[in-house]
A protein has these predicted regions:
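Short, well-ordered beta-to-alpha junction loops that form the rim of enzyme active sites
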Residues: 21-23
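Extracytoplasmic/lumenal domain signature
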Residues: 1, 11-17, 26-79, 84-130, ...
């Protein structure tokens, strides 16, 4: 079978539930892996299925061997990011999906037909696109975080981690905010600075946390960095314990009212472990002038 790594997306207008799947855990491979599903919410029956990578068989437990492990190891190109339903500049509603390969596509939500396709980065265990996309309908942009962490099967090409802004209409690139993965900067930060965690788009600002523990705010129109804060360090806490931050992965930053909530510390795949929950105060005077740590 194939896993479902992320939350489904509900389309009440069409009566459909969308979700993405990962690789097959065992042979033989099926046509339901590395795919996007649309399921009728009344009957539970499949409305359509769109597979992006065929014959992808990989099981993490098989790194130590096993009798039922697939002989052919696939590239492990899950859909970890939930499908995103948004309207383009023409008012057409499309389903936007991103894969660990770095592939980004817009689908017709009624049929699964591919409207446009793009690819950014080289992909890997942590993406490509790993845990989440974001959209800004007012600006007509889709925001795509790319990790390109150098671990995974069959990696080829040059990594290009960072935040990409694409047109919701045709997928064309509007701006790119790169992450400096030079050896010098990696030594300075202590880890790879790619964007694996989910991101969030607010009115004018994109919040993203990276694998090196940096939390950053980007201008939604230009991609310029407005604010950056290093969380991979020790903190005094309100409950009188010393806590330490680390890599930011999986769930990303969360704005709630006038606060920004950040969870820092993730030790998977050799990342920087930790367990710090940070709360920042957003500046009320501007949507791009930010914030102080609490």
């Amino acid at each position: 079978g194939a896993p479902v790594w992320s939350a489904p997306t509900l389309d009440r207008l069409r009566g459909l539930l969308f979700y993405g799947t990962g690789e097959n855990y065992s042979a033989p491979a099926t046509d339901t892996s590395d795919a996007i599903f649309a399921v009728n919410i009344e009957t539970g029956k499949r409305s359509w299925l769109k597979q992006f990578t065929a014959e992808d068989m990989y099981n993490l437990a098989c790194n130590v061997g096993g009798a039922n492990c697939p002989e052919q190891e696939g590239p492990d190109l899950d859909f970890g990011a939930p499908p995103l339903l948004a309207r383009n500049s023409e008012g057409r509603e499309l389903l936007y999906v991103g894969q660990k390969s770095g592939a980004v596509s817009a689908l017709d939500p009624s049929t699964g037909e591919r409207v446009w396709d793009q690819k950014f980065g080289r992909g890997g265990y942590l993406g490509g696109v790993h845990w989440g996309l974001a959209a800004d309908i007012k600006r007509g942009l889709l925001y795509v975080p790319i990790s390109d962490f150098p671990a995974g099967l069959k990696l080829t090409g040059v990594p290009t981690p960072g935040l990409y802004a694409l047109s919701l209409d045709d997928g064309s690139l509007k701006w790119f905010a790169d992450k400096d993965f030079s050896e010098e900067n990696r030594k300075k930060l202590g880890f790879w600075p790619g964007l694996s965690a989910g991101i969030v788009a607010t009115d004018g600002v994109i919040f993203a946390g990276d694998l090196a523990g940096q939390i950053e705010a980007y201008d939604a129109t230009s991609g310029n960095t407005l604010w950056s804060y290093a969380t991979a360090r020790s903190f005094a806490t309100v409950n009188d314990f010393e806590s330490k931050g680390g890599s930011i992965d999986s769930h990303g930053p969360l704005p709630v009212d006038d606060l920004l909530l950040v969870s820092s510390g993730y030790s998977g795949v050799g990342m920087k472990g930790g367990n710090a929950f940070l709360v920042f105060q957003l500046d009320e005077q501007s949507d791009v002038e930010l914030m102080e740590e609490q």
